[in-house]
């Protein structure tokens, strides 16, 4: 087994690569941040926001954010609502597990603090129970059903609400090492990053689970996805989880 000589990331991380000096791609990407013109990137972000600003008329939502209620979600919503003066709608996926008091507070807080509507998907509990057991026993991935919805639900909702500008936090493959080594603003291919890949429907149905129960796990059609313009916030601003936490804390995050 190989480990990155800088951060000790092992080669068991899917898609991770090492250069001739034994340093992982994530560390090299971080080092290259100093060469990025972040002022120019922010101007790109302003132009990107202006492209969609007010697109659905007065009072209409002009962008969307996939949120969990965590520190990064707070940062993303703060950036779009308070800094860029957009009007975001938020999409969230529950997991049907008991939530901590902090978790309950944080998801409520992100709506109350920034004055945003959250549309939350509470997955089909019967299907989740069946699929958790099946995917644990067969693939070692008990949470696949919920993980998949986290990727697909915001896309479906962005299409329904006509909010092509769908915000995600960081490009996990680029920031931490993974399937894609390309730095891009576009999150269009995020659904293919290997975290929650799709499975053939015949693998999923059975034991009381039908295709009707699984419609949201399917990605939107190619035609619908072509109308969307999802993006990574980490492309436009230097991504820093601790600074995100500090901003979130200032706005009521527990």
Regions found by a protein language model. Name each.
Residues 63-72:
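Short, glycine-rich nucleotide/cofactor-binding loops
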Residues 1-63, 79-254:
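Nucleotide-activated chemistry modules centered on ATP-dependent adenylation/adenylyltransferase
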Residues 75-76:
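Hydrophobic positions on the alpha1 helix immediately C-terminal to the Walker A/P-loop
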């Amino acid at each position: 087994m190989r480990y990155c000589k800088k951060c000790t990331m092992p080669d068991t991380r899917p898609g991770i690569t090492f250069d001739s000096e034994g340093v992982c791609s994530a560390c090299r990407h971080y080092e290259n941040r100093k060469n990025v013109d972040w002022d120019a990137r922010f101007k790109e972000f302003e132009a990107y926001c202006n492209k969609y600003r007010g697109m659905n008329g007065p009072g209409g939502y002009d962008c969307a954010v996939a949120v969990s209620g965590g520190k990064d979600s707070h940062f993303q919503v703060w950036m779009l609502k308070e800094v860029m003066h957009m009007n975001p709608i938020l999409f969230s996926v529950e997991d049907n597990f008991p939530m901590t008091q902090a978790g309950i507070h944080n998801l409520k807080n992100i709506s109350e603090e920034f004055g945003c509507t959250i549309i939350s998907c509470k997955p089909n509990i019967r299907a989740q129970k069946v699929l958790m057991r099946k995917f644990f026993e067969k693939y070692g991935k008990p949470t696949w059903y919920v993980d998949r919805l986290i990727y697909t639900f915001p896309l479906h909702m962005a299409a329904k609400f006509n909010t092509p500008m769908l915000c995600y936090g960081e490009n996990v493959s680029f920031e931490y090492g993974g399937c894609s080594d390309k730095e891009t603003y576009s999150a269009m291919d995020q659904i293919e990053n290997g975290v929650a890949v799709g499975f053939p429907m015949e693998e999923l149905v059975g034991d009381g689970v039908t295709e009707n129960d699984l419609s949201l796990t399917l990605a939107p059609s190619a035609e619908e996805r072509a109308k969307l313009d999802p993006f990574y916030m980490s492309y436009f601003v230097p991504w820093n989880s601790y600074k995100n936490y500090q901003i979130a804390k200032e706005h009521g995050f527990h």
